[in-house]
Amino acid sequence: MKWILFLLSFALMSVLNMAAQGRVQGSFAPLKGESRVNFDMVFMNIHGMSEADFSTYETDWQKDKPEVVGIFTNGVNRKLGNSLSVGHFPDAPYTLKVMVNSVSTKGDYLCDALLLDAQQHEIARIDALKTRGGVWGTKLNLIKQGAESAGKACGKALKAALKKAGK
């Protein structure tokens, strides 16, 4: 009986881990030899509202958003290590654009990561990165906790895509 519970637990953890990794389309090979990538983050839906509506509802959002983006990029960079740095590098030839499709009231994120060239054409993408948010706290605290786990998941998926591409 214990053996069956162990196998079921292992299978569940494997499925959850695969769900967080997303699907890779295209190749991240153009990032070979690059040390820096510009970063952009767009929030499509927060707590069932557009970002503009959420800004009206949560008046501090425009002040807090840079911190949330910083938490996300720190998570990405921690997973990437020294191989590549993601941040505000407008002169970099490539941009990693994260489209946050939704942030739930618990801080769960669903996002896509797109690699764009200098002309903003899509080269590659990682679709459907799903992560869990926070456990307790204010709405902003849950969004920040979710940004940290989403950043780590994005960094992990990006690192795997780079490894597959040979970087």
Model regions: which residues?
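Bacterial Sec-dependent N-terminal signal peptides
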Residues: 1-24
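A structural "domain/chain start" motif
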Residues: 19-70, 160-167
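C-terminal/domain-edge helix-coil "capping" segments
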Residues: 21-34, 122-167
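Surface-exposed short loop/turn segments
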Residues: 22-23, 79-144
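Negatively charged, low-complexity tracts enriched in Asp/Glu with abundant Ser/Thr
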Residues: 39-41, 70, 74-86
